[in-house]
Amino acid sequence: MSTREGSLWGGRFADGPSDALAALSKSTHFDWVLAPYDIVASRAHTVILYRAGLLSEEQRDGLLAGLDSLAEDVADGSFTPLVTDEDVHAALERGLIDRVGPDLGGRLRAGRSRNDQVATLFRMWLRDAVRRVAAGALDVVGALVAQAAAHPEAIMPGKTHLQSAQPVLLAHHLLAHAHPLLRDVDRIVDFDKRAAVSPYGSGALAGSSLGLDPDAIAAELGFASAADNSIDATASRDFAAEAAFVFAMIGVDLSRLAEDVILWSSTEFGYVKLHDAWSTGSSIMPQKKNPDIAELARGKSGRLIGNLAGLLATLKAQPLAYNRDLQEDKEPVFDAVAQLELVLPAMAGLVGSLTFDVQRMAALAPAGYTLATDIAEWLVRQGVPFRSAHEAAGAAVRAAEQRAVGLDELTDDELAAISPALTPQVREVLTIEGSVSSRDARGGTAPARVVEQIDTVAATAARLRERLGGPA
């Protein structure tokens, strides 16, 4: 049997927990990241206890001095958990008692439970963590915008079903990866409204009878408000699940971008060249330059999805209020943040370092008869019903395939034989430049619209960064 050393409970137990139980319960190997937040919250709690008349001025000052000393030792690594410490809370209480004595150190626990304490600390940590993730996502957006701005007129094959579809601007395609990331960051901004609610003062589940002020400690800790329901405050982790979803969504969005880079850098596509600093080689094939960053980003998206699924499964069947299952809420979220903090800067660097072969992309843009839609829409503008126009454009493709030529290489007579409406003027849309320029509605791939889009995306990113409290 183990002892109860390092535990915050045990008065009604004759013996300590078994070694197996102690090992299962131990969480300092992952929750120690909450230690700085725990100390900040304990400082605020000390002030609230003093205001409630539960501490004298001398006791308040003694606790604050002890917490300051403990914070310094945690920061420089001279104070760390012992193997006997059950969790971050127990370790820090031990450290405080070592500095101020058991009588004074033991007073800090009045009016709070680990249930409201850890729920608060988790929110504090997560509110900071999502800002770091958002900043990383905006860096990827910045790299996409920079590449788009550097290639305002480059044309590439647009694809659906991975088949050649219509010509589009490279910048338009790159910005199509930026928009989802902007929405992810916007979700993070919106998430903070729900995360900025403090559970502190809720106790184990029923609130406190000691005259403490939850709103006051919420304000001290930078929360917008205190929780309205103490049971909900201690037992709910929807804020963690919401963050885990956004992290998984960022992973999915990065994975789609990564997939494009992987395809584009292949010999068969040949759209981009990878920079030496952002790619790897082979242990046996000297010629290889591998898109490892993109492949790892694609692989880690599955891990992020798994973290979300695991967290939701943990939450799905717990009765109110707190259950020890909730010890399992933090590792998936901590891991998701850690993975994104690795992937995001790597993806930003990868995107920013890509060298595009714009001549090859332009040469491939009309391949696969991607101008067929332009023929159909040109006929519609001449008054031909779209059904008939679609059939005529399809017939033009068939004729070009039979001769193994491009649509622009069909003769005037061949076009007229397909449809009398196909006059020589149709050739104005049988270029990739004419095709993209014609798509001038909002959201289209016309150069003028894409230039506007670059400005809009850059401005949106700057606005979101400002709302998150970071430099523009």
UniProtKB/Swiss-Prot annotation:
Its main location: cytoplasm. It is an enzyme of class 4 (lyase). Belongs to the lyase 1 family. Argininosuccinate lyase subfamily. Its EC number is 4.3.2.1. Keywords: Amino-acid biosynthesis, Arginine biosynthesis, Cytoplasm, Lyase. It comes from the Bacteria. InterPro entries: Arg_succ_lyase_C (IPR029419), Argininosuccinate_lyase (IPR009049), Fumarase/histidase_N (IPR024083), Fumarate_lyase_CS (IPR020557), Fumarate_lyase_fam (IPR000362), Fumarate_lyase_N (IPR022761), L-Aspartase-like (IPR008948). The gene is argH. GO terms for biological process: arginine biosynthetic process via ornithine; L-arginine biosynthetic process. Pfam families: ASL_C2 (PF14698), Lyase_1 (PF00206). PROSITE patterns: FUMARATE_LYASES (PS00163). The keyword Lyase applies. GO terms for cellular component: cytosol. The keyword Translocase does not apply. It catalyses: 2-(N(omega)-L-arginino)succinate = fumarate + L-arginine. GO terms for molecular function: argininosuccinate lyase activity. It is found in: Cytoplasm. This is Argininosuccinate lyase. The lineage of its organism: Bacteria, Bacillati, Actinomycetota, Actinomycetes, Mycobacteriales. It comes from Mycobacterium avium (strain 104). Pathway: Amino-acid biosynthesis; L-arginine biosynthesis; L-arginine from L-ornithine and carbamoyl phosphate: step 3/3.
